[in-house]
Amino acid sequence: LGADAAARTKHIRIGQAANVITFHNPIRLAEDIATLDQLSKGRVEVGVARGVYGREAINLNKEADLKDQAKNFRLFAETLEVLKKAWSEKFFNHDGEFYTYPSPNYVWQHDMSPPSDEFMNMEDSTMKKISVVPKPYQNPQPPIHQVVY
């Protein structure tokens, strides 16, 4: 819906009531929101929440199970941290309770892009950082509105 609103309008801000970020992979969500921000030329507002329905949580991300509220809050905080890193840093890494980026010991194998010490260990070709594409239009990120925390 946001992409449709971006295509049909030129001035209104485009926001979501809340993205339940605990249900999503933070890298995919960061890229999706950044793409919408690019398409709208910086008109995106991001609402984030941790979810309230156990039936959704357990089926979309078992780590978000609301039976353990403390764990759900930690997942929310870590997911938001990854989103902000993905948007604000050219290359980033993250080693948390729920997410580790880049995947440990992943060897760079991409003939179409040159290797760089910005994101890899040049001695053994393992990835040390990753990047999301595109970055948001708004720098460093679209405004974030938290429903919780």
Describe the residue ranges of each PLM region:
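The substrate-binding groove and active-site-proximal loops of carbohydrate-active enzymes
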Residues: G15-H24, K67
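N-terminal beta1-alpha1-beta2 module of alpha/beta enzyme domains
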Residues: L1-I14, N139-P142
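Core alpha/beta catalytic barrel or barrel-like domain that forms the active/cofactor pocket
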Residues: I12, A17, G47-G51
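Internal, glycine-rich beta/alpha segment that forms the wall or movable "lid"
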Residues: N25-Y149
